[in-house]
């Protein structure tokens, strides 16, 4: 029987607790500095202690994972710590589609896939000189919002970019992505596509809390205008959200379109968990500005099951447990090749 492995960060506790609930062995690749934390949790069967997560690329670590018939569950830390080439070189079977993680990390590829899926998107801005209205500037990959900033025009862009460079938040040669800012209620829509059942499941919705942009509302406008600090969009945590029921049909349609587009563009497609991220405007119209092609940290708020998964399963079902069940079913039916790459 396969075991479940992941990096000790992001959503690893949820992933491994779900795997243990499904009766699978659990393995955590853990940095030394976090060993004390993860030793607290009895559902973690084995810790592989490393100095840096990049050691998962080493033959020694991959050999240990192979001996345990491990399936590696990717999350945001894997993408943030390693290049797409490095992730694709990992010999350990990766749950889902490791090739699509490159499309998540590269902004231009990401935009292409979202357009193929006919997701409504903000207008991209190809050059700072073309900023005509409030825009948001983003880094490549899974940066967790750190180093993002807003700009009203080219001068504003250059001032804030230079300040973040001087503070060491971004590098001078870093490629930044600009898109017009979409205002509304933040909604991060999480799905699970099962290649075994060929079925899409809507898991739930969360909102992300970002510092220190969320704290600015408590500062009087006079003091805000005198401050030279560039606000940060660093994600600190998440909270649950339940949508109006009338919005759910469109939610499923967007998820299905994304799955089908992924099959056409980056085989074998969007298998496993993914998230379409955006905002609802005053007319309840959704605009999508991102996608994540793997489990997201927002799923941590539903470790006892989400409202929408409670409608599909007559048991407590976290995303970690859902992943483990897919792996377990695939292993029992000799179909692991359908759920891993």
From Swiss-Prot:
Cofactor note (record): Binds 1 Mg(2+) or Mn(2+) ion per subunit.
Binding locations of Mg(2+): 277, 290
Domain ATP-grasp positions: 106-317
Residues reported in the UniProt entry to bind 5-amino-1-(5-phospho-beta-D-ribosyl)imidazole-4-carboxamide: 10, 77, 238
Enzyme class: ligase
Residues engaged in binding ATP: 132-188, 210
Enzyme Commission code: 6.3.4.23
Family: Belongs to the phosphohexose mutase family.
Annotated protein name in UniProt: 5-formaminoimidazole-4-carboxamide-1-(beta)-D-ribofuranosyl 5'-monophosphate synthetase
Upper taxonomic lineage: Archaea, Nitrososphaerota, Nitrososphaeria, Nitrosopumilales, Nitrosopumilaceae
Gene: purP
